[in-house]
Amino acid sequence: MHIRILGSAAGGGFPQWNCNCRNCRGVRDGSVAAQPRTQSSIALSDDGERWILCNASPDIRVQIAAFPALQPARRPRDTAIGAIVLLDSQIDHTTGLLSLREGCPHEVWCTQMVHQDLSEGFPLFRMLSHWNGGLRHRPIALDGEPFAIPACPRLRFTAIPLRSSAPPYSPHRGDPHPGDNIGLFVEDLDSAGTLFYAPGLGEVDEALLEWMRRADCLLVDGTLWRDDEMLACEVGDKLGRQMGHLAQSGPGGMLEVLAKVPAARKVLIHINNTNPILDTASAERAELDASGIEVAWDGMHIQL
């Protein structure tokens, strides 16, 4: 299984266009040892030729340009993206579909809750129906059964409902439903390599831990170091848990969760611009290094 990190930042990217926190200011003027990042999205493949896009970032055009395998140029108009999987209906995970309209129709795999949000609150399915057949919805069931996507037939996907939040525009933002957010457990039938992918993760219970323990590689929510980080940096008024993100530090935080899991690779993705782990010289980054936890970067490639 080939895993390509197309984008590793949370919504807004890094640096965020209107942010002057220590990290954003520092990456602009060179005073912080960090590299810019686009908004989170990954691509998966079973052969390195046909790819499944997991979430469609607003930065998708730049991400495709940075990864030539997604534009093989075999004909006048071409793409190696054979399907798209949406793990939620967040704006920073779906807006990229608008930039892919010239390649419609696209097979878009998502839950009924995500499809509902993207048909009503942010009606991408209806908007894009005017472009060559638009988006063809392929429903993702929450029955715990693995399913195949024809674009990469040697991969098996299992959708895992997560406790997180629907986007702010959703009519059930304050009333979570199963399927608002999912994680993916992906298995390669040839190599037997396994991936657990959850860029938006608000809570980890014992059932979810069991899925995480089965994975060779974890690619999980790295949004915030502290639950009150947005308030401390004076750039927001919500706690991480109110936004559906489990912070890395503190009791029950992601560091404690990952310490319970034997995966060979533990990687944080969807990193907010305020998170001190973006600074490679920070004490927080040193703590991750000492724990064997990696920080995803744009262009990172993992093979399982």
Curated annotation (Swiss-Prot):
CDD domains: PQQB-like_MBL-fold. Pathway: Cofactor biosynthesis; pyrroloquinoline quinone biosynthesis. Keywords: PQQ biosynthesis, Transport. Gene3D superfamilies: Ribonuclease Z/Hydroxyacylglutathione hydrolase-like. It comes from the Bacteria. GO terms for biological process: pyrroloquinoline quinone biosynthetic process. The keyword Isomerase does not apply. Belongs to the PqqB family. HAMAP family: PQQ_syn_PqqB. May be involved in the transport of PQQ or its precursor to the periplasm. NCBIfam families: PQQ_syn_pqqB. This is Coenzyme PQQ synthesis protein B. It comes from Pseudomonas paraeruginosa (strain DSM 24068 / PA7) (Pseudomonas aeruginosa (strain PA7)). The gene is pqqB.
